[in-house]
């Protein structure tokens, strides 16, 4: 365990609460001390929804520490059952309250006897998994609970009857997901074009009573690696349902996704051929393929970029940059360190290096050393980019409220490909833009911090050298500063004068 003031993925209970609060009429009770109860505030601030967050905190206070939690937890469960009348109550401790080592299973069993709704304890090890892994496990646990319940009651006997027309489930659309609502809308449109019905979307907006119908679909779609694969594997094991793990992000991967659907339907006796649809969308409907061959996009060829985010988005954006737009990806990385083997296999051929870490300082230093023309990452990489004066496009959670847009901004499908191309192109500094702003004045005339993220307090710039540095065009000033400081350190200098600047320029050949 280590102290951190920044985490890419939150603690396990956040993942459990994200999944539970995505379902309709499901309430969560968090057994936690004050301080762990920030999920309500975070979700209310970020998610653009009208409803209150259905989470109650059963506070671990001095009385609980003295007398135990059983009476309080059971009372809160029974009270919420009466007040809210939910279909399900999910009980979860946090990593802090788990230290008490209380028998929450016993509390849940006792509460179930006095409650009309179902009560489930989240089956998550709060010390071993993070938010994403816990969300994946919680979704699978809830699905398994209701399918098992349906089997016991006789509502589900053997393999369920398939829908008359080809249909699918979409697994993994959740609260606080990165552009999830927009991606769902785009996926629905894509499936409608392919004449495929939608059976269920889980967990977002789903009723737990409908989960017994999951097996009626012909196949499952898992758009994100972070949430849904465990449920897809369980449904495959339980009902023999095939599933698609290809993320339809970018023109090439969207075509692969559609061909995978075609293969699954052909294997189930439906002779479909989607090649004409793929060609029409790629060549005439989507603007992404055309734009990638335009003069504007060719200006980006060979430019350097770095990518960091969750496995799904970082891998997809890396492939789009390298394969579809000809941009040189210096390194790509993910904070999903448990998924390193898959990430390496996916993007190893599209970038020079791979960085798997949860340490934001390592990411920041890697960005400073690479000196890319653009960054594609999370909100933390955007902060780093501002300090280094490098533009950043946000492509993955964790994110600020401005990345929960009101307007339609999908990342999946053909419209998503258009949005991504816009994001990538607009993230690069175009030509002499910064330099012209400095020459003619304007909104960007403020003084900018060029300080490297590495410690450089040992070097002093003379007033003349600083004035000379300020004459350098803004889009290369940071690089000139770093090269000069590197030159000075290698020679043991503590002060940078104009002479040192020119010597460094000569040494670096620029």
Curated annotation (Swiss-Prot):
Pfam families per UniProt: Oxidored_nitro, PCP_red
Keywords carried by this UniProt record: 4Fe-4S, ATP-binding, Chlorophyll biosynthesis, Iron, Iron-sulfur, Metal-binding, Nucleotide-binding, Oxidoreductase, Photosynthesis
Active site (catalytic residues): 296
Highest taxon in the source lineage: Bacteria
Family: Belongs to the ChlB/BchB/BchZ family.
GO molecular function: 4 iron, 4 sulfur cluster binding; ATP binding; metal ion binding; oxidoreductase activity, acting on iron-sulfur proteins as donors; oxidoreductase activity, acting on the CH-CH group of donors, iron-sulfur protein as acceptor
Residues reported in the UniProt entry to bind substrate: 431-432
Comment on bound cofactor: Binds 1 [4Fe-4S] cluster per heterodimer. The cluster is bound at the heterodimer interface by residues from both subunits.
Listed InterPro entries: ChlB/BchB/BchZ (IPR050152), LI-POR_suB-like_C (IPR013580), Nase/OxRdtase_comp1 (IPR000510), P-CP_red_C (IPR042298), Protochl_reductB (IPR005969), Protochlorophyllide_Rdtase (IPR016209)
Stated role: Component of the dark-operative protochlorophyllide reductase (DPOR) that uses Mg-ATP and reduced ferredoxin to reduce ring D of protochlorophyllide (Pchlide) to form chlorophyllide a (Chlide). This reaction is light-independent. The NB-protein (ChlN-ChlB) is the catalytic component of the complex.
Organism: Synechococcus sp. (strain JA-2-3B'a(2-13))
Presence of the UniProt keyword Iron-sulfur in the record: yes
Binding residue positions for [4Fe-4S] cluster: 36
Entry EC no(s): 1.3.7.7
Protein name: Light-independent protochlorophyllide reductase subunit B
An annotated GO BP: photosynthesis, dark reaction
Quaternary organization: Protochlorophyllide reductase is composed of three subunits; ChlL, ChlN and ChlB. Forms a heterotetramer of two ChlB and two ChlN subunits.
Cofactor(s) recorded in Swiss-Prot or TrEMBL: [4Fe-4S] cluster
Pathway(s) where this gene product acts: Porphyrin-containing compound metabolism; chlorophyll biosynthesis (light-independent)
Signal sequence segment: none
Catalytic activity from the UniProt record: chlorophyllide a + oxidized 2[4Fe-4S]-[ferredoxin] + 2 ADP + 2 phosphate = protochlorophyllide a + reduced 2[4Fe-4S]-[ferredoxin] + 2 ATP + 2 H2O
